[in-house]
């Protein structure tokens, strides 16, 4: 693809004059850039190769950087001299032509002024070979070890973009230039002066394609070509420039084609808008294989995401869940289906919101089972934590409803069961699949630690899988929000995943216990077994040095080293204790793009290709096995009618017996009591199930919604 770039966006227009450009002094050329960041960006665009090897030490990096900058300065100096010579020649020719054209002096002066303004380093034609788009990472820490510190966020990396459906090429760009020239000629009373046309063509060729647009980053709706994707390797072609200039001169002689040119110009503007929209929302279908691959770049850890915005889709629409008014929502607004699971305090059921038709998970806790003060504290902590966190890899809690007998959590529904189910179905995962799963877990734990929350219950049973194959952490009953990063001393969690410092509660424990549990999970995912058995020997091994045995010989040394560093008995030596960036920077994650992984809504998850995931029809089974709350209400309304019909039948039967004059013997008092007892049981059997299922809907309840809520249930 070929395109015309407006100018170097990173070089100020007033920083170069003809005198400085002809001297070729390195210090003068260096002053073109506002800072070292802009110069580094130009280097990245000029050379299609890494600037230096990030594994080298600082001295070698400085030498390589200086050498690269010198070569760039020489290239820029030559290009600037050629450009200024061509522009000065054009200016002199235009001045001579102006003396012979008295009727168009004003137009020629304007054109000369525009060309004089173009002495400020505007690029001529740039030949593009491939289709690429720019990807700018979000803010990140500075690169250390260089002679000048360069912000990492300014380094732009190229991602392939499929623009096969967009008919944007150099010919269209030239057509737009021709149309602008013809429009200018018509505005000047259709004066077909070739010299004036040359001036207009030169001015418009060096400036932006649209005469009214400025050489800056345009919005998606502006009709410029500044946002057309380009490849960092570009070449300056003076021959192509002269050829296009001659073609423009010939096309300007056709002054009668103004209407046709306007139509072509409008079509080009529409295509340009479509191109800008395609850059804002990628036209390529995301693929799991190439999504996690990135160009060679330094592995630099960005700060953890603290505030996650509502999920947006590719078309710009918001998640439908955000349209629900949770403050006015009641528990009776949901239809309840089958059970998703049960625990010591309650059960989880599938439910559906009537207004939106969206599925949710309702976690119901029975107050009668929560008697101990420690249990009450865990429930209060869970509610306060779940209502105040929001992350793509954590189950979202939207609202809670409190009744005199029950507590209801309305949470995000992950319809592909949990990680333990898929691990049992596949026995173990491949190393690549495990890497993608663990990377998502790392982001979730990193977010919790940034909020001063210790998870303390990481295990495959608490890692749910959503419809796209991504992980979702759930069950924050054992989580603890600390103040100022202080340690906690309570002993809780699942024994197989407990860190040694939890068992030795004298000094307390902190956030590193989650990284220990992660090491156990990684070992379990790739081997299908736990590293420690549930025995006294296992307890002793956690307190002393141990040696893990990997029976699978195909595992790489990187994953073994990753597990060993996570399962360090000393928390101060454990990977991720002082900074989660040490986990991201581990060599096992060298091919993971963390920036892309943090925005996961447009791609399929790591489990989406497994047979256990594809064949998991949890929603359909639950809907087939259970009845909705609406159907239960209809049955409850129909019961009085059935009773009335039964009473009518009894009356008819009694009337028939009276007509036949049967003689009945009176029953004994004992038989009468038995008959009443049987009738009582019969009536209870008809209504018992409905009364039990709908008891919570008839009770007065209060609700708490997400968004900075602090609630105390007990």
From Swiss-Prot:
Catalytic reactions on record: L-seryl-[protein] + ATP = O-phospho-L-seryl-[protein] + ADP + H(+); L-threonyl-[protein] + ATP = O-phospho-L-threonyl-[protein] + ADP + H(+)
One GO CC term, this protein: cAMP-dependent protein kinase complex
Modified positions (Phosphothreonine) in chain numbering: 488
Gene Ontology molecular function terms on file: ATP binding; cAMP-dependent protein kinase activity; protein serine kinase activity
SUPFAM superfamilies: Protein kinase-like (PK-like)
Region (Disordered): 88-122, 174-266
Binding site for ATP: 340-348, 363
Pfam families in UniProt: Pkinase
Ranges for domain Protein kinase: 334-589
CDD domains documented for this protein: STKc_AGC
PANTHER family xref list: CYCLIC NUCLEOTIDE-DEPENDENT PROTEIN KINASE (PTHR24353), DEVELOPMENTALLY-REGULATED PROTEIN KINASE 1 (PTHR24353:SF110)
Stated name of the protein: Developmentally-regulated protein kinase 1
Gene name in the database record: pkaD
């Amino acid at each position: 693809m070929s395109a015309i770039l407006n100018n170097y966006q990173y070089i100020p227009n007033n920083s170069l004059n003809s005198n400085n450009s002809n001297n070729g002094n390195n210090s003068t050329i260096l002053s073109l850039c506002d800072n070292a960041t802009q110069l580094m960006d130009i280097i990245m665009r000029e050379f299609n190769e890494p600037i230096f090897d990030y594994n080298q030490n600082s001295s070698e990096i400085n030498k390589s950087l200086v050498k690269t900058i010198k070569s760039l300065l020489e290239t820029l100096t030559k290009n600037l001299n050629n450009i200024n010579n061509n522009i000065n020649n054009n200016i002199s020719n235009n001045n001579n032509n102006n003396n012979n054209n008295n009727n168009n002096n004003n137009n020629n002066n304007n054109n000369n002024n525009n060309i004089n303004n173009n002495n400020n380093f505007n690029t001529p034609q740039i030949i593009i070979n491939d289709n690429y788009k720019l990807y700018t990472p979000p803010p990140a820490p500075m690169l250390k070890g260089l002679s000048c510190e360069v912000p990492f966020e300014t380094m732009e990396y190229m991602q392939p973009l499929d623009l096969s459906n967009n008919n944007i090429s150099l010919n269209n760009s030239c057509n737009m230039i021709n149309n602008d020239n013809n429009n200018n000629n018509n505005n000047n009373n259709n004066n077909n002066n070739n010299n004036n046309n040359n001036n207009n063509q030169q001015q418009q060729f060096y400036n932006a394609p649209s005469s009214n647009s400025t050489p800056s980053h345009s919005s998606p709706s502006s009709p410029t070509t500044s946002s057309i994707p380009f490849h960092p390797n570009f070449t300056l072609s003076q021959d192509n420039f002269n050829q296009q200039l001659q073609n423009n001169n010939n096309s300007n002689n056709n002054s009668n084609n103004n209407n046709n040119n306007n139509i072509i110009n409008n079509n080009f503007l529409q295509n340009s808008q479509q191109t800008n929209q395609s850059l804002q929302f990628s036209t390529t279908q995301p693929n799991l294989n190439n999504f996690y691959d990135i160009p060679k770049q330094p592995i630099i850890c960005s700060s953890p995401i603290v505030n996650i915005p509502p999920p947006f889709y590719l078309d710009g629409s918001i998640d439908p869940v955000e349209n629900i008014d949770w403050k006015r929502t009641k528990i009776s607004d949901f239809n309840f289906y089958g059970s998703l699971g049960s625990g010591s305090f309650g059960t989880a059921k599938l439910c559906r919101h009537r207004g939106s038709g969206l599925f949710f998970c309702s976690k119901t806790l029975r107050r009668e089972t929560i008697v101990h003060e420690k249990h009450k504290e865990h429930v209060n902590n869970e509610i306060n934590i779940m209502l105040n966190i929001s992350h793509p890899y954590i189950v979202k809690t939207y609202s809670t409803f409190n009744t005199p007998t029950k507590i209801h959590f309305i949470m995000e529904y992950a319809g592909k069961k949990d990680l333990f189910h898929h691990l049992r179905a596949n026995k173990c995962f491949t190393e690549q699949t495990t890497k993608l799963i663990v990377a998502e877990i790392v982001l979730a734990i990193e977010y919790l630690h940034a909020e001063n929350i210790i998870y303390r219950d990481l295990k495959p049973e608490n890692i749910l899988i959503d419809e796209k194959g991504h992980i979702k952490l759930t069950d924050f009953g054992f989580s603890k929000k600390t103040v100022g990063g202080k340690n906690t001393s309570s002993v809780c969690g699942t024994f197989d995943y407990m860190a040694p410092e939890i068992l030795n509660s004298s000094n307390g424990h902190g956030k590193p216990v989650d990284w220990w549990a992660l090491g156990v999970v990684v070992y379990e995912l790739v081997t299908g077994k736990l590293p420690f058995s549930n025995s006294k020997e296992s307890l002793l091994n956690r307190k002393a040095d141990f040696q893990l045995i990997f029976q699978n010989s195909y595992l790489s040394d990187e994953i073994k080293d990753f597990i060993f560093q996570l399962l360090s008995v000393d928390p101060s030596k454990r990977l991720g204790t002082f900074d989660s960036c040490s986990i991201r920077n581990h060599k096992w994650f060298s091919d993971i793009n963390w920036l892309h992984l943090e925005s996961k809504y447009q791609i399929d998850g790591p489990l989406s290709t497994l047979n256990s995931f594809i064949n998991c029809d949890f929603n359909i089974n639950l809907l087939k096995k259970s009845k909705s709350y609406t159907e239960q209400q209809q049955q409850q309304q129909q019961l009085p009618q059935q009773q009335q019909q039964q009473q009518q039948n009894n009356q008819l039967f009694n009337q028939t017996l009276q007509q036949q004059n049967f003689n009945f013997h009176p029953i004994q008092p004992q038989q009468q009591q038995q008959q009443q007892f049987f009738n009582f049981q019969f009536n209870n059997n008809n209504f018992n199930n409905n009364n039990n299922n709908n008891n919570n809907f008839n009770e007065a309840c209060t609700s708490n919604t997400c968004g900075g809520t602090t609630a105390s249930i007990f």
